[in-house]
Amino acid sequence: AIFKSYCEIIVTHFPFDEQNCSMKLGTWTYDSSVVVINPESDQPDLSNFMESGEWVIKEARGWKHNVTYACCLTTHYLDITYHF
């Protein structure tokens, strides 16, 4: 799948600013007893990334999380969050 992501841009220190964006992939419909997601790597696949002449990705990492929410403290949900 190919995803598009939009992040809030803060340009206080333009043109020397750095932005941080996150993309969280997971399910709220099915818990970890039904759906297990595992990243292939902690580095996202950027093969379909479209470069920009205005900025570059300096670093990209991903982490898997086992999360519980206030509504359902005994139910665990998995997600993978990538930070750019």
Curated annotation (Swiss-Prot):
One of its GO terms (cellular component) is postsynaptic membrane. It is found in: Postsynaptic cell membrane; Cell membrane. The keyword Glycoprotein applies. InterPro entries: Neur_chan_lig-bd (IPR006202), Neur_chan_lig-bd_sf (IPR036734), Neur_channel (IPR006201), Neurotransmitter_ion_chnl_CS (IPR018000). It catalyses: K(+)(in) = K(+)(out); Na(+)(in) = Na(+)(out). Disulfide bonds join 7-21, 71-72. One of the alpha chains that assemble within the acetylcholine receptor, a pentamer of two alpha chains, a beta, a delta, and a gamma (in immature muscle) or epsilon (in mature muscle) chains. The muscle heteropentamer composed of alpha-1, beta-1, delta, epsilon subunits interacts with the alpha-conotoxin ImII. Upon acetylcholine binding, the AChR responds by an extensive change in conformation that affects all subunits and leads to opening of an ion-conducting channel across the plasma membrane. This is Acetylcholine receptor subunit alpha. It comes from Herpestes ichneumon. The lineage of its organism: Eukaryota, Metazoa, Chordata, Craniata, Vertebrata.
